[in-house]
């Protein structure tokens, strides 16, 4: 909500790559809180909220990008869990050693699932399995097979993940079968807002750097003293106009972001049901 938006702007302005990590974790927390079983919430939410573990979102496959109906990853029932097999690409912070565990939310199909997006289910697949006492157990059958080469944000590891190169990665169903896309959209909607805040933070950083450069760079004469000494370029009217244009756009972005954040707060936390519904 509002606090997250303010902190998100600051984090993204200072390090947009690192901010992606907690953006995904925050979205996963909301998805698990809304749709996961009591047992899964008890096992995973505390560690995710504390930042001891981080979360990812696994949708895209080599043949399935914007058309998620083409997803081929499989989930085979086995007792109280499923065996996940498939490959996911473009997974932000899909592999790293910043935390002890990484919790993957993975879209996959069960054997009896209908075709298209109506047959997609959502599964929680931890990098390390969790023992009954909450300690970490053996490594799950999920591996990072490569890191994507990107034009920017290199400090954010964008992974290609292979699930089930061996016996199959152990995964736990979130909610009900064939409702995975519905649950994943809880996380995706959080991420969409977070990416908007990311743009705000980067824009604020760009303005601050442009302002600092305009104060430091000495070039040309002051228009009111053409025979005087050279001056910092912030003294030139057109440079000041460009800086004010940047600042006004950033302020407009900030206002929009904080209004939306306040609506998030109202939708989730207002004491009056009518107020909550009005914010949705």
Residue ranges and their predicted role:
Residues 56-78, 83-96, 276-280:
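Flexible, glycine/threonine-enriched loop-and-boundary segments that flank and lead into catalytic domains
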Residues 63-66, 95-97, 114, 150-157:
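Short Gly/Pro-enriched turn/cap motifs at secondary-structure boundaries
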Residues 3-12, 16, 23-26, 34-38, ...:
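Glycine/proline-enriched, intrinsically flexible loops and inter-domain linkers
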Residues 18, 28, 53-55, 69-73, ...:
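Structural beta-strand/beta-sheet cores of well-ordered domains, especially the beta-sheet scaffolds
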Residues 81, 85-139:
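A short core secondary-structure module
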Residues 111-114, 130-133, 151-153, 183, ...:
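N-terminal functional module detector in eukaryotic proteins
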